[in-house]
Amino acid sequence: MASSHSSSPVPQGSSSDVFFKKEVDPTKHIRPVQSLPDVCPKEPTGDSHTLCVAPSLVTDQHRWTVYHSKVNLPAALNDPTLAKRESDFFTKTWGLDFVDTEVIPSLYLPQISKENFIAYQQEISQREKIHERCKNICPPKDTFDRTLLHIHDKSRTDLEQVPKIFMKPDFALDDSLTFNSVLPWSHFNTAGGKGSRDAASSKLLQEKLSHYLDIVEVNIAHQISLRSEAFFHAMTSQHELQDYLKKTTQAVKMLRDKIAQIDKVMCEGSLQILRLALTRNNCVKVYNKLKLMATVHQTQPTVQVLLSTSEFVGALDLIATTQEVLQQELQGIHSFRHLGSQLCELEKLIDKMMIAEFSTYSHSDLNRPLEGECQVLEEERLVSLVFGLLKQRKLNFLEIYGEEMIITAKNIIKERVINKVSQIEEIDTDVVVKLADQMRMLNFPQWIDLLKDIFSKFTVFLQRVKATLNIIHSVVLSVLEKSQRTRELEEIPQQRSAGKDSSLDTDVAYLTHEGWFISDAFSEGEPASAAVDTTSQRNTSPHSEPCSSDSVSEPECTTDSSSSKEQTSACAPPGGIEIIVSEDMRLTDLELGKLASNIQELLCNASDVCHDRAVKFLMSRAKDGFLEKLNSTEFIALSRLMETFIVDTEQICGRKSTSLLGALQSQANKFVNRFHEERRTKLSLLLDNERWKQADVPAEFQDLVDSIADGKIALPEKKPVVTEERKPADVLVVEGHQYAVVGTVLLLIRIILEYCQCVDNIPSVTTDMLTRLTDLLKYFNSRSCQLVLGAGALQVVGLKTITTKNLALSSRCLQLIVHYIPVIRAHFEARLPPKQWSMLRHFDHITKDYHDHIAEISAKLVAIMDSLFDKLLSKYEVKAPVPSPCFRNICKQMTKMHEAIFDLLPEEQTQMLFLRINASYKLHLKKQLSHLNVINDGGPQNGLVTADVAFYTGNLQALKGLKDLDLNMAEIWEQKR
């Protein structure tokens, strides 16, 4: 059968010895070995099989196969299509030594011989002999297996004849579908004429079912015959088992009788003693319970007494202890069924009393007269209140204190204003009713004194708030420290109890008829030392009554919960009062840490409140533009006062408040804008009225410049009038250099120093002042350029013309400002934070603009002479007399130019200017000579020109400061090519 080839129920041969050969059954199906295809296939002969084996050029042309001669060395060597074998296939490419070279054996591989297997053969020979002997004794398994396989296949074939519906586990004839499948009534017809056929079909169906039954019975009989030995063995074992059970029941009955006798003789008396001990302990418990009830009954009167003395913490501890006893020890006592709710209401009442008490304390503490030392009011009372509020988790008491702070800050300003106004007789309070209007009637000295008084009161107020909050903060930290220490102590007993529980779990507990465990009786009778250990950890309220003097009932006086949870200890806060920190006060570390941070935040809020009230006070005074009308001295005094208050509050609170600082910055910005506009307007008026003539330099300006040279960038202090007055100088001497300047520049230097001094007095406006100062310097540069170079002064001032002297004077003024720009830059750089140093680039831009302006003025002076040379030399003729009128006129104009600028400009600049003028002169002269065809040939015309040039050179070098000037007049002649 086909199934016999797929699986075999009997193992084929033994696999116990892997070293022995197995006999292979020749009848078994062996898969034929497929030979590799021939390298050189035969020519197709029409056989289909041959065609299938051979490669296909169509299908295999893109797939690599062994038929590719490119990669198949044997195919390349044995190719029959070649005309001849190439014997020198390798040698012709790789040399003659390629074929004859022998492969050297590996040094790491040993030589294996038969001697290496001798030890293995000796070891295995004995086992091989035993195996051969056993194989001869035992019958061959192949025959047995073949027989069983044949029988199995036959029975399986018979069973396959039975329909599958009979083999289903849910086979039931009461199912209509199953019944119709087994008995197909559709084949039977009760109508006449077909009765004989129906009878035959019925008979045939009955025979078929009988045949199926026979097959099943034969298979069942066969299976029973195969397992008959196991059935007989089971029946025999059943009889033996019944005999064993009968003997066992008899032995158990005898054992029970003996145990009953032993129990009666040896155990009943001892158990009776234990029962009596349990009864006695129960009586003691009832007695202690009654005493505890008597103590609890006195709770409410005791709480009333404690509240009358403001002992909130003690009353709360007593209520908490009583609540714990009611929930554990006295649970279910009918007479105390309402006591728990009464204590809860009493606890809520205490909460309200503590909050009201804290509010009263806050009002009393913050509204004390702001004189004297900053001591805490009734420190012990504060500590007691804070502990009570923490115990009840009433953490909003800081909000009450914060609200009281706001009210107090408002009252401080109101009281100070009323006090100040009442001292001034000029203010009629009956006419001016509003307090703000009365305050606005104060002049600046009176108002600044009032502000100073308010700031001093605010400072004392903040110091008192800080002292009070420090006490609260220390209480919170003590509770936090105690909580952490208690948690560490609780972890140690838990670790010990874990070890004890593991040993107690193995003990045997005997249950009596009363439902008690004997182990309970032993635990009740533990030595007194253990009881003392437990009571030593308990701590009741100091106002609770003692339990009893009975030593027997002492361990039962307090509850188990008090011994396990209410471990309290006395802590000493800064107030000196000892407050008990109970387990009930179990705020988490997160809550306590948050509360501590809120306390610090409340102190900062107090500072913010003071700053906010001060800002409102300033704004109410600034409504009529009072602050904007302050001069520099007054505003600096106000700014310093406000900055001092900001620093003082920052030292107290540890954080800088921004509201007053912002108000100061806002007023400072307004002051800076007004300050700058005033000076810009002043500079504009000075420039519009400047006639650009050299001005005398008063002695005070020379002193101002000298102080700048000494490193003091500030306006000099006003000195008393001296009878001896110094005469003004012609020029301004700056570090040994003389500067001829106009009056506007002198005042501009003073204005610049005012900007620098304002930065020193008000550091917060440094950046704004830098921007405004650069704007002022740019304005001076651009406006002076418009007036002088652009000839705007002709219309503004009414000058007839812009002379070379005006130009030189303007250039020298610009040079003076350029000289002081690095000094100003260094002054601002020292006062700017490093991150704002980028703003200093404005000074570099201004310096470049000034240098460009100076260069334009120099170019303008050269252009004036250039136009003169062009006009005069264009009419020049080479003829007598010598020197010619043209050259006389040129020398005259050069002398005037020198006289105009020499006393104004430095000698080096004058020389550079005349070198440029001389270059322009040579260019025009060369052009005219070229036009006249005068060359350097030594002729008469050349002599005349040489004489004129010598006259020009002599006159120019005779001018002051131009003696050593290299004129290089040979350049006027055309170079010969």
UniProtKB/Swiss-Prot annotation:
Its main location: Golgi. Residues 528-573 are annotated as: Disordered. GO terms for biological process: apoptotic DNA fragmentation; astrocyte differentiation; cellular response to progesterone stimulus; gene expression; homeostasis of number of cells; homeostasis of number of cells within a tissue; in utero embryonic development; intracellular calcium ion homeostasis. Residues 532-570 have a biased composition (Polar residues). One of its GO terms (cellular component) is perinuclear region of cytoplasm. Gene3D superfamilies: 1.20.1280.130, 6.10.250.860. Residues 239-261 form a coiled coil. It holds the Pfam family Vps54_N. The keyword Protein biosynthesis does not apply. Transmembrane segments: none annotated. InterPro entries: Vps54, Vps54_C, VPS54_N. Keywords: Coiled coil, Disease variant, Golgi apparatus, Membrane, Phosphoprotein, Protein transport, Transport. It is found in: Golgi apparatus, trans-Golgi network; Membrane. The modification Phosphoserine is found at S8. Belongs to the VPS54 family. Acts as a component of the GARP complex that is involved in retrograde transport from early and late endosomes to the trans-Golgi network (TGN). The GARP complex is required for the maintenance of the cycling of mannose 6-phosphate receptors between the TGN and endosomes, this cycling is necessary for proper lysosomal sorting of acid hydrolases such as CTSD. Within the GARP complex, required to tether the complex to the TGN. Not involved in endocytic recycling. PANTHER family: VACUOLAR PROTEIN SORTING 54, VACUOLAR PROTEIN SORTING-ASSOCIATED PROTEIN 54. Component of the Golgi-associated retrograde protein (GARP) complex, also called VFT (VPS fifty-three) complex, composed of VPS51, VPS52, VPS53 and VPS54. EIPR1 interacts with GARP complex and mediates its recruitment to the trans-Golgi network. Interacts with VPS51 in an EIPR1-independent manner. It is linked to Defects in Vps54 are the cause of wobbler phenotype (wr). Wr is autosomal recessive and is a spontaneous mutation discovered almost 50 years ago. It causes spinal muscular atrophy and defective spermiogenesis. This is Vacuolar protein sorting-associated protein 54. It comes from Mus musculus (Mouse). The lineage of its organism: Eukaryota, Metazoa, Chordata, Craniata, Vertebrata.
